[in-house]
Amino acid sequence: EVEKRLNAKEFKENRSTVLIATKAFGMGIDKPNIRWTLHMGIPSSIEAFYQEAGRAGRDKNLAICNVIFSEVDAEQTDNALSGDGNLVDLRHAAQKMRSNDDDVSRALFFHLNAFSGTEEECSSASDVLKIIGDLNERKKVKFTFDNNNSKSDLERSLIRLKKCGIIEDLEVNYSSKNIFVRIRPFDFEFSRKTIENYIRESQPARLKNIMSKLDDIKTTDESRQPQHLCNLMIDFTYDVVERSRRRMLYEAILLGRNYSNDNEIRQYLLNYLQEGLGAEKIAQLA
């Protein structure tokens, strides 16, 4: 960690000319005179690529961006990502592509790690709620994780509960491998409002449907309402977020596959981003 910070400091102070970094670390580099970026692998979306490439040329002088992209079997990629299949179908397709060992198979591996499935997530959320116990009092609960996978699953469940207004805040301590969670007393109307606000900001066209489902949950046994609310948010995440990220990944793959000329890529990016802005406004009006 100390070495990483030192390398970044030397790069930003022009005492080093090259920096190799992960996407997350590289996005934190604010330096106006970067002349060249080299992207290994597929960006998660065209928007992400636009932001990552934007690390270079901030002083308005010429900067060059290159992407190294590998795809063994375009037909397999299209079969996996071009349709609107469910997550089980995608998992089977990704399994067949593992031996390709290309950027597409690696991108699918990370995507599927981020989305384990609705049944798995609902079960994990149920386990977390059991550990939290009584939701009628304000309290602080400590969770411990063993490895990166268990941390990811646990943190994902806690974030879902936070979006439901059940968890007030959470803090991760990596050195002790603990997550400290502040719980607010459960209030259905507060959770309802929290979810409505989240949907209104992210997917306003779906708000009416979500509100109808919230009305149904309100009629259920109060002790089961937190789980029902979390299940609702998990279903929404997979129906909207997972499918959206899958589609964005495919669009990034098509960009890498079909365009190599500077002007073509630049025009494609501009058209794509402008279309996205227009689509967002239409969705808000729907």
Regions found by a protein language model. Give the residues of each.
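C-terminal helicase lobe
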Residues: 1-25, 29-286
